[in-house]
Amino acid sequence: MLIIGSIIGIIADRNREYLINGQFLRDHLHLRKAIADKDKVIKSNDIMIFFAFGQSNSANYGEGGYHCRNEVYNYYKGDIYKAEEPLLGPDGKGTSVWSRLGDMLIDSGLYKKVIIIPIGIGSTSIQSWVEESSAKKLDQTLNYLGKDNIKPTHIFWQQGETDNVDGTSKNQYKERLKMLINVFRKRNIQAPFYTSITSYFPYNNNNPLGINKGITEAQQEVAKEVPGVIEGPNTDSLNLAYYRYEAVHFTEKGLDRLAYEWFKKIKAAEAN
């Protein structure tokens, strides 16, 4: 027993940050059962397969709970599960905007089924996704998708708060966002890439209302200049107290509104 206890202690120490944020437990002890007919779901007609990533507000840091009412699925490391909160993939242990969005897309009749591929990580900068630790997670996930011959139909990027605090310049952000888009294009994933307009963070910066215009202009300009990139919702506009707890992450009401703003952007783009 002493030996077993020592081994557990070593593992826990080496993975203490992983354990704290709940990611380790969900990776190894989530106890969820993968669906048996994975290929049948993937090959369904009228299905959206969306890749969703960024920092905490894309990564299960929302308040409250949510239960999907439609055929909304969660792809994770080669398996597909019925979507449950917290989604498998992101590092947060709360609730996501993406499950709500999946239901809205199906309720609207735009799609009959939705598969979510979520990999968001709290507090990450855009540089982390193109050159540092988060890039490894992105690459690993794309490798899993490649093995399963799955290509996302849509890509949703929601990030910018950390770059607001870090003081990332407009030109730096633009260049890194283009690099991030090219990660998908180099793998022949030509799905539309939606970038939210996101920078709002009320602490640790001197920007008016906590909004960094350099970051938001970079996101808007990439959407205008780069083929296949679409401007997503302006999350900075959802900064009222009843939309955010601790002034940063989304409440249940905030998640409902955020999902609706994503839905409107997708519906408008697909009507063209």
Question: Model-derived features: where do they sit?
Answer:
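Cell-envelope and extracellular/periplasmic
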Residues: 5-272
